[in-house]
Amino acid sequence: PAGDAERLRYAINYGADAVYCGLPEFGMRSAPANFTPEQLTESVIYAHARGRKVYLTMNTLPTNEEADRLPEAIKEAAKAGVDAFIVADLGVLDACKTFAPDIDVHLSTQTGITNWAAARAAYKMGAKRVVLAREMTLQDIAILRDKTPPELEIEAFVHGAMCMSVSGRCLLSNYMAGRDANRGQCAQPCRWKYYLSEETRPGQLYEIGENENGSYILNANDMCTAPFIDLICKAGVDSLKIEGRAKTFYYVASVTAAYRKALDAYLADPANDNFEL
């Protein structure tokens, strides 16, 4: 993940084969975690000089007005030399194919692909890769891989935050804080501290868990799959994705390095059934 040019360099220097990032519009992250067009061009040059790739996120669900601005944004990104667009909306997919036909298109996890039929349909529509819904099990992934064309690349998230809703399709932030999660502005109310109250006992708040500060009753545990990266690879995953474009340099460097080490350990002896980090 790369929230800016410096974090992109950290990701590459600590072992990433490819980096994903976004422009100020269409990228599912608020302003501080995006690139200017000039930074994107410079970063693509930096990555390509080191044999790495840059994928541009365009995975919001655009309004009618935003859709009018898609062609220019796509052509600008193509001029910068990005290696693929990551999209969630069918209109964006079509626009990418129309205005940058030579650049690969990946379907974002926001698309909510949870089965082989959806993945196969994505391939027929021109997707080079699908980023699977984070809710899929290893068995689900293996079945999907077995029933889809081998040319279709499979990508899965292996580390980072998990949304309480299926693949981020959540309106809680919009409802409670007026901040649209589908515009990269999630306030993460699922991580706030909540108490239980009973309507006939106003003012009496009950802890749901054992934590004296309240209990996190909505959010899922964060994802960490490094200890069983071998099982993910054996299920048929081609690309491992780390969440965190808005995270710190330290996070990008340390997590990228950890998964680089885990993946290299597996690839050094993929036939070993007793994989350990």
What is each of the regions a protein language model found here?
Residues K124-A127, M136, K147:
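Extended, well-folded interaction surfaces typified by the phenylalanyl-tRNA synthetase beta subunit core
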